[in-house]
Amino acid sequence: MQPDERTRVGFLLEPDTWVGGRNYFRNLLIAFAQLPDPEIEPFVFTSKEDDTALAGIPAVKVVRTSMMDRRTLPWLARKITAKALAGDWMLQRLLNQKGIAVLSHRGPLVPNSSIPSVGWIPDFQHVHLPAFFGERDRRERDRDFMDLCRKCDKVIVSSECARLDLQAFAPQYAGKAEVLHFVASPAEQGILPLLPELRQRYGFEGPYFLLPNQFWAHKNHRIVVKALQLLKQRHQRVLVLATGETKDRRHPEFFDSLMRYATECDVLDLFRVLGVIPFNDLSGLMVHAVALINPSKFEGWSTSVEESKSLGKRILLSDIPVHREQAPALGVYFSPDDAEGLARGLCESLKDFDTESDFRIQESTRVNLRSKQVQFAETFQQIVLSTGRQ
């Protein structure tokens, strides 16, 4: 299909988009580039500031606008206009000028928009774990999710679990739900730092496990700390490197309380926090790890689980419904409240680990990755095309 015949689909990448959201869009756009003859053409609207989230992604048109640069005159004019006219009319005009036929992963910008929209609800965590949210946050999420369901032509969810949640949350809009299982696209191994370089940069030695979750309360880091304490008491040394954002907006005290707990458990030498690190370093740590860990109490569709599947890495993961749905072939499940079970999984994984066989599995997994990326992209493409035809 010729480029001028393709349906143009717009994405809005605001500067304050959360890290998980940016990674989600990156994985989707990289997968889309694998389609041999696409019928849609992605346009990403973002700020004029440098944005590494879009670096190296082919087949994507990027439209940079000062309307997305915070505290600039165009941004301020956009905000004032949106408030006065009850709609983001300045950005809507830009989308119309670029011929956008479908707006993806957000609600319509203006009332009765001429551009159909496909909303996105990452998860219904606040329904399942209300204690992790304040009353105001729960009300806002209820309101925002219901607005998406009502105003959007379709609503993307990442799992069958989330589709059932939407059906229970807004049964009158259940028919709008579209399940899109995303696939992680790891960096090319040739550009990743080698293990000796990573060891020197981050100051660790020996085999290690990687916990690449944000430091948010529901991510359940405490169970990992407890498992390390149990192992240390038995004179078994297991090193866990933890990466991710250390600020939890809803629980600002969480990280400090976690580190106090790690101190009390005497495992600061085994639970090493690296924080937010460059993407290629994170990918390199995944490649060389004994295994990944995801102990989370709740997920919409876990990025780290998908990364383990795309890389061909073992992962120790909490036994929750969405992790069962993701079904990693090399997954080792444990109850999210069972430190003993996690400790056992860590020991067994360390004992089983062999560098040569691990890299052979990774190599064979990469051979099959493209077909999964294509399936991911084709599913999204059909959602967009069917929305545009309505």
Predicted regions mapped to residue ranges:
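Carbohydrate transferase catalytic cores enriched for Leloir-type hexosyltransferases
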Residues: 1-390
